[in-house]
């Protein structure tokens, strides 16, 4: 008789634990509709992550931009110092006409 009582207690344990999380969660668990719960949790995670990124960018955005943006005559990311970028093959003679796509 004690075995049947402990078996019933073990079967009721998940319902008791899930009931502590909330009655709605318990109803969904009992209905075996965990897809809805998983979707809600993933959606909540996505929203919280995006809010965290937005908040962090608000605090540290200028610092990050300052690390990667170096104004000057170099390349777009400022990696070439003092305008030493020189590509003579890209230059054209002053008297040479501009070429169009059809040529």
UniProtKB/Swiss-Prot annotation:
Ubiquitous. Highest level of expression in kidney. Present in monocytes, osteoclasts, macrophages, synoviocytes and synovial lining cells (at protein level). Glycans are attached at residue 77. It comes from the Eukaryota. The modification N-acetylalanine is found at residue 2. Residues 27-40 are cytoplasmic. Keywords: Acetylation, Chromosomal rearrangement, Glycoprotein, Membrane, Proto-oncogene, Transmembrane, Transmembrane helix. It holds the Pfam family T_cell_tran_alt. Residues 71-103 are annotated as: Disordered. One of its GO terms (biological process) is osteoclast fusion. The chain crosses the membrane at residues 9-26, 41-61. It is a multi-pass membrane protein. Residues 78-87 have a biased composition (Polar residues). GO terms for cellular component: membrane. PANTHER family: T-CELL LEUKEMIA TRANSLOCATION-ALTERED GENE PROTEIN (PTHR32267:SF2). Belongs to the TCTA family. May be required for cellular fusion during osteoclastogenesis. This is T-cell leukemia translocation-altered gene protein. The gene is TCTA.
